[in-house]
Amino acid sequence: MASGIQPDAGQILNSLINSVLVVDDALAIHYANPAAQQLLAQSSRKLFGTPLPELLSYFSLNIDLMRESLAAGQGFTDNEVTLVIDSRSHILSLTAQRLPDDFILLEMAPMDNQRRLSQEQLQHAQQIAARDLVRGLAHEIKNPLGGLRGAAQLLSKALPDPALTEYTKVIIEQADRLRNLVDRLLGPQHPGMHITESIHKVAERVVALVSMELPDNVRLIRDYDPSLPELPHDPEQIEQVLLNIVRNALQALGPEGGEITLRTRTAFQLTLHGERYRLAARIDVEDNGPGIPPHLQDTLFYPMVSGREGGTGLGLSIARNLIDQHAGKIEFTSWPGHTEFSVYLPIRK
């Protein structure tokens, strides 16, 4: 190496874009580089001595597993750690190494945006494939169902004993029930009539409908951005989307009750389905219920997937389909005590 002035370790750590922490076995912070201070929104002086989990609303890291790996003399890596600070969710790749004097070095790197985008695209493709499969099956069910209903009607007219028509009545009623289920599985087949108006009109209709269903221990909060521009949309379809999500939130709260927040904001420079938009509307539905079980999160928008006993699992699948027809997207974050669905609708390129 050429001779000259060499940067010390502090200069190197200060210049890193990755967050670096030195913690003890209790995860109390003894050092935080500038990137970590920015991530945790605290100065190094305030961070010193504070256990890392106390700064976070949610931390998905398996701390016991990390300690076991370090105790065995091995490093530890988790390529997808979620942490939440002041309602801001971050997905990071975390690496841990044992240091002398029982300290632990934690390095946290933001998850690559391209990787996140690829995962979203893969999940979206899988959801479309599942939806197409269900639609194909629904069409196959619908044809013989019509024949079954028609035959039951003819049989009802031919039966001499009125008491026997009770059985054909049951067949017809159950055939109609199945047909309604199939129609819901198929969902809307064509884009609706789009008009340009404030999305808050739709939000207020949803509030009016849900308010009649609210128990006394549930509070519905409206947090609207008055500067949000008007945007082209089908009011009935967006109403159905928001109604499905808000009702899911209400059911998730259960008998314990809680809060549901309906929030609107303007999003800037957003990519939707490969198109870049200067402006988009973001509509959030947030609740403080128990959260979505981790085993359901990857398949939540698939047809027939539900975390509720007796649920059809169609509400979010239909909502995703309707938002796709608006060239928008739905995403969510969830951990115990917090679930938030965000609907993005394009305003202008």
Swiss-Prot record:
GO terms for biological process: nitrogen fixation; regulation of DNA-templated transcription. It catalyses: ATP + protein L-histidine = ADP + protein N-phospho-L-histidine. ATP binds at residue 329. The keyword ATP-binding applies. Its main location: cytoplasm. Member of the two-component regulatory system NtrB/NtrC, which controls expression of the nitrogen-regulated (ntr) genes in response to nitrogen limitation. Under conditions of nitrogen limitation, NtrB autophosphorylates and transfers the phosphoryl group to NtrC. In the presence of nitrogen, acts as a phosphatase that dephosphorylates and inactivates NtrC. This is Sensory histidine kinase/phosphatase NtrB. The gene is glnL.
